[in-house]
Regions:
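S-adenosylmethionine
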Residues: 1-455
Length: 455
């Protein structure tokens, strides 16, 4: 791979030489292909055709030996699985750690995925969270928000709200009718970034990279987190992630959030065999001293039988060549304040309020008009009769072609299914049937042989 100008020198100023050399070598490797199954759709023993092992930090994740034409598989459109990069599935391990650790005692009633499109992390969150926990999946970009709504509808869980709004507008909407009535218990901020972790997959990530672009992204990330901070309750959890390697967008931003907004970093236990790295900076030996006492505290309060083999990282780096996945970074912070306090004083620090006044993206300040809620119930007709389709019929349905339903099919709205998984709706008129699959979701790509990953 031809790396951007200044890439090597930029990282050598910040990382050890051997770590830079390993990163450059890893970026020359081939990216892996991975999917994550929907536990509400497929049984635990389900394994895709061409599976090449499970993703170690996410039991629902599988590597594939090669990349099939996913569009030609009806089960993808039915929400039976999601094509997701393996490193980003680390969110599953983090959320399970948060929910099941005796230390956090998180009452998970409302969760926000702030920058959620196209939906990989939101679908993962929805699979892990309690059914009575409300998930708000947000995307500020209108086109990407439509894709997010489609994927959440297909994943098939009723307790989801998809919104299109900026972070500041969401913070202002807390308490408004029809939205969250209280600050969020957990916020995932998978913030826009310079995209270093996607360089093996996307030429644009290579072309756009520069030290100045990294600095711009780091500033934007701080602004986004500052804007959403009032929407996180005192004692609530922020999961911060990027698909980058550099310390400006990663370690330094997390430390800035902790220092300026008021939070503590939470070390995450990881298996050494996973290959996940911690703080990558040259001076990390000094920085590690800051976390040593905190790390011991969490070990004592959350003892596990195999704790001696676990590494606790306040920063989690996924580096190509060292993990089987693309570049990714994640850290967890807990907002200062009592978990019982949800008052405005707990929710907003003076520094956060000062930054909010400087923000130019407020518009007219009307949160209700600035926040758009997108429908996710377009497939909801659970009481309708079900009609099973063949593989070829399922693809034709997904292309919005006309189908002839069996003669015994009841008239009216029916659910059409493939392998027992609902694809969508049709209206049977007797002599013909109207295809009600949403036009904007239809398969537009050229011909591909229909297939499915799950027999």
């Amino acid at each position: 791979m031809q790396l951007p100008k200044d890439f090597d020198s930029y990282f050598r100023e910040r990382w050890r030489d051997e770590d830079v050399a390993a990163l450059v070598a890893g970026l020359d490797g081939e990216p892996s292909v991975s999917i994550r199954v929907n536990p509400k759709r497929l049984p635990p023993e389900a394994e895709p055709e061409g599976a090449d092992g499970r993703v170690p930090w996410c039991p629902e994740g599988f590597y594939l030996k090669q990349r099939p034409v996913f569009t030609a598989d009806p089960l993808l459109h039915a929400g039976a699985y999601y094509v997701q990069e393996a490193s980003s599935m680390f969110l599953a391990h983090v959320v399970r750690t948060i929910l099941h650790s005796s230390f956090f005692t998180l009452r998970c009633q409302t969760v926000l995925d702030l920058c959620a499109a196209p939906g990989g992390k939101s679908t993962l969150l929805r699979s892990l969270l309690p059914d009575d926990c409300r998930l708000v999946s947000n995307e500020p970009n209108r086109v990407r928000a439509q894709v997010l709504a489609e994927n959440m509808a297909k994943w098939g869980h009723p307790n989801v709200v998809v919104t299109q709004a900026y972070a500041a507008d969401i913070a202002h909407a807390i308490g408004k009718a029809g939205f969250a009535q209280r600050p969020f218990d957990l916020i995932l901020a998978d913030v826009p970034c310079s995209g270093e972790g996607m360089m093996r997959k996307e030429a644009e990530a290579v072309a756009q990279w520069s030290p100045s672009f990294v600095a711009e992204c780091a500033a934007l990330q701080r602004s986004i987190v500052s804007d959403i901070w009032p929407a996180l309750r005192a004692g609530g959890i922020l999961i911060y992630s990027t698909c980058t390697f550099n310390p400006e967008e990663d370690e330094e931003n997390v430390e800035w959030i902790a220092r300026e907004l008021g939070a503590e970093m939470i070390p995450i236990p990881v298996e050494p065999s996973w290959g996940i790295r911690g703080d990558m900076r040259k001076e990390r030996e000094i920085e590690d001293i800051k976390y040593k006492i905190q790390d011991i505290k969490y070990k004592i309060q959350d003892i596990r039988a195999h704790q001696s083999s676990i590494i606790n990282h306040p920063f989690c780096h996924f580096l190509p060549g060292q993990v089987r996945g693309e570049g990714f970074f994640m850290a967890v912070l807990r907002k200062h304040g009592s978990e019982e306090g949800d008052s405005e004083d707990d929710a907003e620090s003076p520094k956060a309020l000062k930054r909010k006044k400087k923000d130019k993206r407020k518009g007219n300040g009307d949160a209700a008009s600035a926040l758009t809620v997108l429908p996710t119930d377009v497939l909801d007709e659970t009481g309708a009769p079900r009609v099973e389709l063949s593989l070829e019929e399922a693809i034709r349905y997904l292309q919005r072609e006309a189908l002839v339903l069996p003669a015994e099919t009841p008239r009216g709205i029916v659910q059409v299914c493939f392998r027992g998984q609902r694809l969508g709706l049709m209206k049977n008129l007797g002599t013909r049937a109207n295809n009600l699959y949403p036009k904007e979701w239809r398969i537009r790509s050229g011909y591909a042989i229909p297939h499915t990953l799950f027999a």
